[in-house]
Amino acid sequence: GGHHGNASQHCANAIHQLAYTITEIHKLASPMPGAPEDFTAEALKARGIVDAGQFIPQNTVNVGVIGSTNDKISVIPGDAFCEVNIRCFSTAEQARIDEEIKALADKVVIAGTKVSITGGMVTGPMEKTPQVQKMVDIYKAVVKEEFGGEVNEWVAGGLTDGNRTAKFIPTLDALGVENYDEHTDHESVDLKTAVPRTAAFAITL
């Protein structure tokens, strides 16, 4: 870095390069289904849609953190970084995104800068295999026979221990109690769902 007024001619702006790199990262994301306001919980409920997960794109990309050691607007930043979160529904898509992001290290637009990519995919997706479908069918049959209920099969973009176990064994997830406002300080559960869901899980086993 250097002084913006006196050293622009021999300094390279790392944040400027990072802006280009972030733009390229977001180009890898699957297109969204439409205007965000049409897919809030309230909007979907008004349309009678139960499975909100069906609208989650094949992959989602989020540059959630950016930064630099520079804290003065009169100084050309010599470093900058970002942290990226990627979610995919298939291992093939995950591998493709990983490869394309790493290739961005060679995509330097601002002369005098360089791009370094560190890290990688940490946890795999929980793919729906034929074995998983068989387990889903068994669980649905148990709920119908024992409680006369119907199971809404959801797709979700979150991350749980199920993502880790799915790498080794067929896995069903989210069979616990109904909850609301997850990851907030006012998260709550519906206790009326505790007994039937626990019983259905035990019978399935």
Predicted regions and their residues:
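Metal-dependent amide/peptide-bond hydrolase catalytic core
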Residues: 1-205
